[in-house]
Every structure is written in C-alpha cells, then in structure tokens.
Amino acid sequence: MPADEMLIRQLKQSDYPALVELIRRTWYAQQADGNTDGLEPTCDARHRNTLAWHLAAIDAYDCLARTTYAAVVERNGRIIGVILGSVPAKVTRMQILRHRWQQASLALPMLANRAGRNGLREQLAILHADRALIQTTGNDYQAEIVLFLVSPEAKGQGVGGRLFAHMLDRFHALGIRQYFLFTDTTCDYGFYEHKGLQRAGVRNLALAHGEQLQCFLYQGRVNDKER
C-alpha cells in the first residue's frame, strides 16, 4: 500500500488498544485522574493506569457488547478512524456476557476512589439518557451506528465520510433500511444533519461541576441522500 493511502478494513481484536486510545483522546483527554494503581495498564505507557484510559476502555467494551460489524481506517500502520455498527437481531448472548465481564473487571476496582466513582456515575447517567431517548421514539430500529470516531489530526480529510458510507453499504447489503445513532453536544453532530439524518429526540443532562450536556438520537434511512 503506497504511503499515506487510507485502507478501510474490519476491526480486529488486536486493534482494541487503539480503539480505547481513540476514545480516550476524544472524550477523556481532560479527565482528572484518581489513583488507579494495580489496574491493567494500557499498551501506551504514557497513559498507564490512568482513570481516563479505564473509563475509555469501559466505553469501548460497552460498544463492543452490541457490535455486529466494525471497521477502521488505517494509514501508515495507524488507525485514524473507527465505526461500529449493530444489527440487534445478530447480537449473541455470549458476546454480551464476554464484553460485560471485561467492563466489570475494569469498573470494580474504580469504586475504591472518589474520582473513579464519579467517572462511572457520569457514564451511567449518559447511558440512562440514551435509553430514555430510544424509549421516547417508540421505534424498533433495524440497526444502530454504535460508535463513529475520527482522530483529530485526520478530520477534514474525508476519513469520516468514507467510513460512514462504508457502514451504510454494509447495512444495505444486509437489507437494512432504517437505523439510528446516539450523539451529544461533545460531538460534531452537524455531520449527521449534513448527511440527511433527522433528530428524533433530545434530552438534557446535568453533569458534575454544573456542566450541561444535550444528548440526541438521530435516525436515518439507507439509500437516502446520506449515502
């Protein structure tokens, strides 16, 4: 593969550390750390035993627990984008249990300190907001885009557009016509509106230190203009 050429391929288990690191850089880079000595370290020694990394890993396993297809963009041997999709009918019980066990093994030691408890509490609040959004719509969607991330240095280079189109092609091949995704004000949700998705729900969430977060549910149809 020529230098600087982008390759879209399926996510492999060996990519999980890179997935966690991308989540950490996107949402937890400013996370204040507590003492997490003794927890399993990241492959990146600079962030070893950090609260931010463990919260990111918990997020990753939460997403993987319901993912049925995942793809990454690789350039020069480095993952610069990832997208996870789910067709609920294809999610297995063993898959859910395997990833929930990983989540629990990461979360339990974090209960021993205040920073860890606060981080977990915030994650749960967002998950509850997402569940409330899906219940409010009353729709039984065929598929979900579970996670969609592009590394900061790769934004504006067409990486996100290619990844998004790749997932929609996958949905199309499976006969999926309608899908949804969760997003919030920490994300570039304007991308989804540009792709033709419609906002189907919004929920306001109060976080620590008086911060406010708006959580959204967007829905789209395969074969509409977002493809």
Regions found by a protein language model. Give the residues of each.
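Conserved GNAT acetyl-CoA-binding A-motif
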Residues: 142-143, 171-184
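Conserved acyl-donor/pantetheine-binding loop and adjacent beta-alpha core of acyl/acetyltransferases
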Residues: 89-143, 208-211
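Conserved acetyl-CoA-binding loop-helix of GNAT-fold acetyltransferases
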Residues: 150, 156-169, 194
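Active-site rim helix/loop that mediates acceptor-substrate recognition in acyltransferases
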Residues: 27-70, 75-76, 132-134
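Conserved beta-strand-loop-alpha-helix junction that forms the acyl-donor binding cleft
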Residues: 146-148, 152-155, 180-190, 205-209
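Conserved beta-strand in the GNAT
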Residues: 72, 78-87, 128, 132, ...
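Conserved active-site alpha-helix within GNAT-family acetyltransferase domains
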Residues: 131, 161, 185-202
